[in-house]
Amino acid sequence: PLDSFFPSMTKESAQKDIEDGLIEVGLTSDYLGRYPHELSGGQCQLVAIARALMPKPQLLICDEAVSALDASIRGEIIDLLLRIKSEKKLTMIFIAHDLAVVRKICDRVIVMQSGKIVEQGPTEKVFFEPEKEYTANLLSAVPVPDPRKEKEKYIQRTQAE
């Protein structure tokens, strides 16, 4: 609860801050009285983001924040996180297996294998000039929406074998 972060906050002030938090993530104050089972997965995630931002953190940790969401709401949440990161000058640790999302959101990437860091660096460098074989294999396994590029990747893989 908010009073653990702001013990001197009045109920009215807390109510206003909560409403502002919901509005910031694109929800209305109508959501205040709803139970989790009355919300969609995307709405639950938006409420979770609003709650995480209430104490005005300098660091936001997002662990698979969009992995279980439909593509349409996933894009909205990604855009929201990018906006929040920029507007609030927030440091964000974004944990994900979806490399397309990682590439869109992250400035720096850490690649882990069996719980150990195998490579790290600026996102574009890691994605386009991986230094470790594990990272290169991981990136080459990502499906490419363009069938011609997917075919090129397949040919390169089979020629390397």
What do these predicted ranges mean?
Residues 35-39, 43:
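Conserved ABC ATPase signature
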Residues 12-30, 139-140:
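Conserved ABC ATPase "signature" region
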Residues 102-104:
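A short, surface-exposed alpha-helical micro-motif characterized by mixed small hydrophobic
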Residues 56:
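Conserved catalytic motifs of ABC-family nucleotide-binding domains
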Residues 49, 77:
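Hydrophobic anchor residue at the start of the ABC signature
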Residues 120-121:
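ABC ATPase "signature
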